[in-house]
Amino acid sequence: MMSKNYHIAVLPGDGIGPEVMTQALKVLDAVRNRFAMRITTSHYDVGGAAIDNHGQPLPPATVEGCEQADAVLFGSVGGPKWEHLPPDQQPERGALLPLRKHFKLFSNLRPAKLYQGLEAFCPLRADIAANGFDILCVRELTGGIYFGQPKGREGSGQYEKAFDTEVYHRFEIERIARIAFESARKRRHKVTSIDKANVLQSSILWREIVNEIATEYPDVELAHMYIDNATMQLIKDPSQFDVLLCSNLFGDILSDECAMITGSMGMLPSASLNEQGFGLYEPAGGSAPDIAGKNIANPIAQILSLALLLRYSLDADDAASAIERAINRALEEGIRTGDLARGAAAVSTDEMGDIIARYVAEGV
C-alpha cells in the first residue's frame, strides 16, 4: 500500500495500560502484514512505571524516544501507589501534561460512538439510543480560560475575589477550525461549532473566524450552537451531530458528556495533535488499577487509539477503517469483555485482542 517507513513510540504506562497495549500491538502486527506497511516500534517507560524505574514520571529518554517517532501510542498512567507524591510528580500531571506541552499538542479529538448491540448501556431513552450516534468532538487544547492571563486571587474579607481570563487569538481559532473541517471531510461533512456568542467577546471572534474558514470548505455544512443548547441537544438527539468544534472549556465539558452517553468508557479513544500532524493517542478512560493484571480489561479503546494514529499521523485511512470494521464485527457477533457482558459469557482481554487481530487479517 505504501513504502514509507514509520516509527511509533509505545508508552504502555500503568494499571491496565501494559495489557491493553499488548492487544493493540497484536492488531498492529495484523495491519502490517495485511497492508504491507513498514512500521517499527520502541517501548518507553512513563508514569508510575517510570517513577519506579527512573525516579521520575517522564524520563528524558522517553521524551527523546517520542521526538524520534512519527507518533506516540500511549497507554494509561496513575494509581494509588503514587498518590502520596507531590502533584507535579504524580504520574498524570508529571507525564501527560508535560508531553502535551513539549510537543505543542493543540487539538484533542475524542470520538464517541454508540455501537450496534450496545444500546442497552446508553443512559439515554431507548427510542433515542435506537437511532445510534457517531460524534467526533474536536477540542482546542492550549488556549482559552485554562491558560489565559491574568488569573489569580486577591483582596480579603468581603472584597476577596478570584479571576480567570478567556483569551483566544485568531491563529488558535483558525488552526483548530481547520482540523474540524478536515475531519468532517473524512466523515459525514458536517461541523457544529459551539460557542456563547450571545454573551462572550471571545465567542464572537470564534464565530466570525469559523465562518471565514468555512468558505474554504464549501463541501462541509456548518452550523453554530450555543453551549447551553448543545448540552441539551446531545441528550435529546445526539444523532444530529457529526463533528463538534469546541474551545478548551466547552470541549472539556462536551467531550465528557459525549463519552458518558455512549455508556462504555472502555470503548473510547482520544488523539492529541500538533500542527505537523504528530500525535499522542490514548484511551479516554483511566488506568483502572483495581482490575490490572486480571486479563479482564476491555482493550478496544486502546485498539481504536491505534486506528486514530494510523488515520491522522500515518495517513493510512484504509488500515484504520479495517480495524474499525473488525471491532464492529466482533461486537455484532456478541463478543464482549466483562464490562459489556451483562451476565453473558465474557472473553478475556487477550481473547478480545486475538479476535480483532484475526478479523483485521481476514479483511472482514
Curated annotation (Swiss-Prot):
Binding site for Mg(2+): 228, 252, 256
Cofactor remark from the record: Binds 1 Mg(2+) or Mn(2+) ion per subunit.
Required co-factors: Mg(2+); Mn(2+)
Pathway per the UniProt entry: Amino-acid biosynthesis; L-leucine biosynthesis; L-leucine from 3-methyl-2-oxobutanoate: step 3/4
Annotated EC: 1.1.1.85
Site feature location: Important for catalysis: 146, 196
GO molecular function, one term: 3-isopropylmalate dehydrogenase activity
Disulfide bonds: none
Binding locations of substrate: 100, 110, 139, 228
Known catalytic reactions: (2R,3S)-3-isopropylmalate + NAD(+) = 4-methyl-2-oxopentanoate + CO2 + NADH
One GO cellular component term: cytosol
Pfam families: Iso_dh (PF00180)
Primary subcellular site in the record, as a coarse category: cytoplasm
Domain of life: Bacteria
Protein localization: Cytoplasm
Enzyme class: oxidoreductase
Key words, A-Z: Amino-acid biosynthesis, Branched-chain amino acid biosynthesis, Cytoplasm, Leucine biosynthesis, Magnesium, Manganese, Metal-binding, NAD, Oxidoreductase
Binding, NAD(+): 79-92, 286-298
GO biological process, one term: L-leucine biosynthetic process
Family that this chain belongs to: Belongs to the isocitrate and isopropylmalate dehydrogenases family. LeuB type 1 subfamily.
PANTHER family in UniProt: 3-ISOPROPYLMALATE DEHYDROGENASE (PTHR42979:SF1)
Free-text function comment from the UniProt entry: Catalyzes the oxidation of 3-carboxy-2-hydroxy-4-methylpentanoate (3-isopropylmalate) to 3-carboxy-4-methyl-2-oxopentanoate. The product decarboxylates to 4-methyl-2 oxopentanoate.
Subunit structure as annotated in this protein's UniProt entry: Homodimer.
Protein name: 3-isopropylmalate dehydrogenase
Gene: leuB
